[in-house]
A protein has these predicted regions:
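Glycine-rich active-site loop/strand segments that organize a redox cofactor
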Residues: 41-104, 108
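Glycine-rich FAD pyrophosphate-binding loop
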Residues: 27-52, 243
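Glycine-rich dinucleotide-binding loop and its adjacent helix/turn
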Residues: 163-216, 220-221
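N-terminal extension/subdomain marker
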Residues: 7, 20, 24-28, 94, ...
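A conserved short coil-to-beta-strand element within the FAD-binding core of flavoproteins
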Residues: 128-143
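Short hydrophobic core segments
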Residues: 134, 152-167, 210-211
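N-terminal Rossmann-like FAD-binding beta1-loop-alpha1 element of flavoenzymes
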Residues: 4-39, 210-229
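Dinucleotide-binding/catalytic capping subdomain of oxidoreductase cores
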Residues: 110-124, 228-243
Length: 243
């Protein structure tokens, strides 16, 4: 439980949701003059963005909302502008921005927050990023301890878990697809990272591709398998590249 003195908090995972929580905590701690020490455990190279908005992924991966509907107001005093003013070159209001560009912005927001906290003396929020995963949790006498890289960290008053989209047990349909791929020697590939999918697809010319699901990710996959391999869309329809 949090008290009036310095409270230690651990965050497992970050990404956009975790970044939003950190920014809110920074604002709250400054307004209420409460001190927090926060350890963030996330092995991802761009923890502010997370894998779904990887700044290094293919620009063929697009958001499903146009630029005009993206409202990402930064905290006051953060020293960074909103996404529309930050991104260069500017993106038209009716265009759907590449997810990697939004990921780069989210990572810049995190770096601005880290720089802001490290550059202040007597700040209310102290942030430490540990680029590692957490293997185990335990609670002793009301406090939490985390095992990461063979070392126990803690004690922590509170734990915030932001797992994103962790691996889960395959459902019946995916299990059937896995069995089919194993017996037919077919390739069962994930949609992301899109660059990895694109590299694998260079060997699929003339083959039939089945896409599991039909949502945002499926449109990314379709772009990767068409324009990503050199195909073009024109007034007369689609012209494949032959790859």
């Amino acid at each position: 439980m949090l008290n009036e003195q310095v409270s230690r908090i651990a965050m497992i995972g970050l990404g956009p949701r975790g970044l939003g929580a950190l920014e809110a905590l920074a604002t709250h701690s400054a307004a209420k003059e409460i001190k927090f020490n926060v350890d963030v455990f996330d092995p991802y190279p761009a923890p502010g963005a997370g894998p779904n908005f990887d700044p290094e992924d293919s620009p063929l991966c697009l958001l499903n909302i146009p630029m005009r509907d993206i409202q990402l107001r930064p905290p006051k005093g953060s020293g960074i502008s909103g996404f529309a003013d930050w991104v260069a070159p500017p993106i038209p209001n009716d265009a759907f921005p590449p997810r990697p560009q939004l990921g780069a912005y989210l990572q810049a927001r995190l770096e601005a927050l880290l720089a802001q906290q490290s550059g202040q003396s007597g700040q209310n929020l102290t942030l430490t990023h540990l680029p590692a995963s957490v293997d185990q949790l335990r609670q002793d006498e009301g406090h939490w301890h985390l095992l990461s890289g063979g070392i126990w960290h803690g004690p922590y008053a509170e734990i915030l878990m932001v797992p994103g989209q962790p691996k889960t047990q395959p459902d019946d349909q995916l299990g059937d697809w896995q069995t089919h791929a194993k017996h037919s020697r077919a390739t069962l590939a994930g949609a992301y990272p899109a660059d990895k999918l694109q590299a694998s697809a260079k060997h699929w010319a003339g083959q039939t591709v089945a896409i599991r699901g039909f949502a945002l990710s499926s449109f990314d996959v379709i772009r990767v398998l068409t324009t990503g391999l050199g195909g073009t869309f024109g007034p007369d329809g689609y012209s494949p590249s032959g790859q």
